[in-house]
Regions:
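Short, functionally important structural connectors and interaction interfaces within domains
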Residues: 104-107, 117, 146, 162-164, ...
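Conserved PLP-enzyme active-site core in the AAT-like
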Residues: 1-142
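Short, mixed-charge, low-aromatic patches
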Residues: 2-5, 158-166
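Conserved core segment of the aminotransferase class I/II
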Residues: 137-163
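Structural motif of enzymes handling amino- and sulfur-group chemistry
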Residues: 125, 134-138, 161-191
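A generic structural signal for well-ordered coil/turn residues at beta-strand boundaries
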Residues: 114, 131, 148-150, 166, ...
Length: 191
């Protein structure tokens, strides 16, 4: 399985791919253009080469605001190609995603609606403490199937369907990080 990222992508992507078991040899770094954006033609070529060599493209990770240069990958073109090729598309908007709250910066996310998941970090621009992140997913059921476990001691007595956020990530529990962002929005508004 191959993971495709821009050569400008954040190092956490490589770390995550290693943790997920892909191995560094399956992380394909796609060249960037003069604006530090992923070269879509190079991406298409690498995917075609890998398919011809018997590899399976699993995921493309596009970046909306690279940490080192602020580069913005052409999400619309990348999303269209991922849809054609049936490849999962994740958008790493950790650094610049908070700017999407402002109408004048929403052009950056053109094409992001074609992504399967997107993450941004309010702690970088929106006055929240460290580790406040927002993660959008198109298909929550796929995420839940990945992380869900239900040993006897976690079974509840309710017959009413509830959302168990323990099934949305590796830890079974976590701090209420969303409260940080809620307080900022309540205190300062969205305008």
């Amino acid at each position: 399985l191959r993971v495709y990222v821009s050569q400008e992508a954040h190092s956490s992507i490589e770390q995550g791919a290693k943790i997920a078991g892909y191995g560094v040899e399956n992380i394909v770094k796609v060249p960037a253009d003069a604006q530090f954006s992923m070269d879509v033609e190079a991406l298409k070529a690498r995917i075609a080469e890998d398919r011809a060599a018997g590899h399976t493209p699993a995921c493309v990770i596009a970046t909306l605001g690279t940490t080192g240069t602020g580069g913005i990958d052409p999400l619309k073109d990348i999303a269209a190609h991922c849809k054609t090729e049936n490849i999962f598309l994740h958008v790493d908007a950790a650094w610049a995603g908070s700017a999407l709250l402002l109408p004048e910066w929403q052009w950056m996310a053109e094409g992001a609606k074609g992504a399967d998941s997107l993450v941004f970090n309010p702690h970088k621009w929106l006055m929240t403490n460290f580790d406040c992140s927002v993660h959008f997913v198109r298909d929550k059921d796929a995420l839940i199937k990945t992380f869900s476990i239900l040993p006897e001691y976690l079974k509840g007595s309710t017959n009413v369907p509830v959302t168990d956020f323990r099934d949305w990530g590796v830890p079974l529990g976590r701090r209420f990080r969303a409260l940080k962002l809620w307080f900022v929005i309540r205190s300062y508004g969205i305008n």
